[in-house]
UniProtKB/Swiss-Prot annotation:
Pfam families: F-box, FBD, LRR_At5g56370
Annotated ranges, domain FBD: 375-433
Protein name, entry field: Putative FBD-associated F-box protein At5g22720
SMART domains with a match to the protein in the record: FBD
F-box domain span: 22-68
Segments passing through the bilayer: none
Gene3D superfamilies: 1.20.1280.50, Ribonuclease Inhibitor
Top-level taxon of origin: Eukaryota
Length: 468
């Protein structure tokens, strides 16, 4: 009897606790609930409408819309949903703070993005992200002029749209802008869009097949991070140029770009640079004068970034550096971290290359196969091995698809590893990937031979990592 009473008391407490929690939620004002729903993807926010009658239309009052067209049965259903949502917002005189759309449309699908953006482009809009799936340039939708005067806009990402001519830009709060594979009225308007954002800090520009931006000028007094990427196959290469003038720029990423000329001015704030993928500068020419111009251009470019402390470069950028700056290459005295890809035939130039980084502490090498392996001779010892290098990691790449492979014991890799441990005076760690994780491979003769390398540094450890 007593036990039953205790159970009943516990049950009553549980029910009361549940009711208290339910009452707590129900006591929240609609404005707070809609703010909570704002942080959900719209598809998930809509599902809350089944909770109760009160929740049935609360999601319609959220100040944000995040939708993916592929989540709907077809494109027309997607358009109808967005139109109804914006229609409700218009009737209730609501202003959206955020609009994020990921759209996949065909050539015959109706245009709608222009009018949607025009509706949400109010002084209260803070976040706009529009991505339209790969489509022909004839299907690109035009950005309305109203967007260029959103005074509260903080974040802007535009993908596969058309930016027409405009008379003025007023985006006083915009800090992050990403322009990806769009069409621009002309190069001057693109330059103006970038330079007239007074607090812009983060800019990403991805070139596309239709943008026809032969000269990209990035001028800003506030920019701290810049990303430029994309394969610009349709450029007039002889006249293509990227000019960067950003006094506060700290991070620069150039990836798979083919601009003939690259100029960086006022680069004193740069700390990290990535030169990735296909890195191109001026076609080779038999004309000695043209070849001299290219050497000067490449030398000036690397000199302009020589103050960085962290750099990552592709095999193409490495080749450009070796062929066009030696023997008077710029010194990267502040550089402590370097990651570089190298084709195996170019490995013999590695010591000379490393001489440009006298205070290097960390080195990551990605090896790329190109021709059959040959005898590797490394005799010269650069200054950084004798004074500063503490960490080395060697990564391998397959010959066919350039993907990383697991290896130990290959002649070139063995000699390269031996070169570092025998010549680095303060090396703390050498990291090598295993060719196999089987016990037979791990405890093979080659494995133990690596561990028995004579080491110039008494504190050097050799580490194997499976699966790199």
């Amino acid at each position: 009897m007593e036990e039953t009473k205790v159970k009943r008391t516990c049950l009553e407490r549980t029910v009361c606790s549940s009711k208290a929690k339910e009452d707590l939620i129900s006591q929240l004002p609609d404005s707070l609930i809609t703010q909570i729903l704002f942080y959900l993807q719209t598809k998930k926010a809509v599902t809350t409408s089944v909770l109760s009658k009160r929740w049935r239309s609360l999601w319609l009052s959220t100040p944000g819309l995040v939708l993916i067209s592929n989540d709907f049965t077809d494109y027309n259903a997607f358009v109808s949903f967005v139109d109804k949502f914006l229609g409700f917002s218009r009737e209730q005189k609501l202003c959206l703070h955020k609009l994020k759309l990921s759209i996949r449309k065909g050539e015959n699908d109706q245009d709608c993005v222009t009018r949607w953006i025009d509706f949400v482009a109010t002084p209260k809009l803070k976040h706009l992200d529009v991505e339209i799936g790969p489509t022909r340039c004839e299907c690109f939708e035009v950005i309305p002029l109203s967007l260029y005067s959103c005074e509260s806009l903080l974040y802007l990402r535009l993908n596969h749209v058309c930016l027409g001519k405009f008379e003025s830009v007023s985006l006083p709060c915009l800090k992050t802008m990403s322009l990806e594979q769009n069409i621009y009225a002309n190069e001057a308007d693109l330059e103006s869009l970038i330079s007239t954002c007074p607090v812009l800090e983060d800019l990403s520009f991805v070139s596309g097949a239709y943008d026809k931006v032969n000269v990209l000028r990035v001028q800003s007094q506030t920019l701290t991070s810049l990303n430029i990427e994309g394969c610009v196959e349709y450029l007039d290469l002889d006249k293509s140029e990227v000019l960067i003038d950003a006094t506060r720029l700290k991070y620069l990423n150039l990836e798979a770009d083919q601009y003939e000329s690259k100029t960086i001015r006022n680069s004193g704030s740069l700390t990290k640079v990535n030169l990735l993928g296909y890195f191109h500068m001026k076609n080779n020419d038999d004309d000695d004068e043209v070849d001299l111009q290219k050497r000067d251009m490449v030398h000036n470019f690397f000199t302009s970034i020589s103050g960085v402390s962290d750099m990552k470069i592709s095999s193409q950028a490495f080749a450009l550096f070796i062929m066009n700056t030696m023997p008077f290459s710029p010194k990267f005295c502040n550089l402590s971290c370097l990651e570089v890809e190298i084709f195996l035939p170019s490995l013999e130039t590695l010591p000379t290359f490393l001489e440009s980084f006298p205070n290097l502490k960390s080195l990551i090498l990605g090896l790329r196969y190109w021709t059959p392996k040959k005898e590797l001779r490394l005799s010269f010892v650069p200054r950084c091995l004798l004074s500063s290098l503490e960490f080395v990691e060697i990564k391998g790449c397959s010959r066919s698809n350039m993907e990383r492979v697991k290896y130990v014991g290959e002649p070139i890799e063995t000699k390269l590893a031996r070169y570092f441990v025998e010549n680095s005076t303060i090396l703390k760690k050498l990291v090598l990937p295993l060719r196999s994780s089987t016990p037979e491979e791990i405890y093979s003769v080659d494995f133990w031979n690596f561990l028995e390398f004579p080491r110039r540094s008494s504190i050097c450890q050799i580490t194997y990592v499976a699966g790199l």
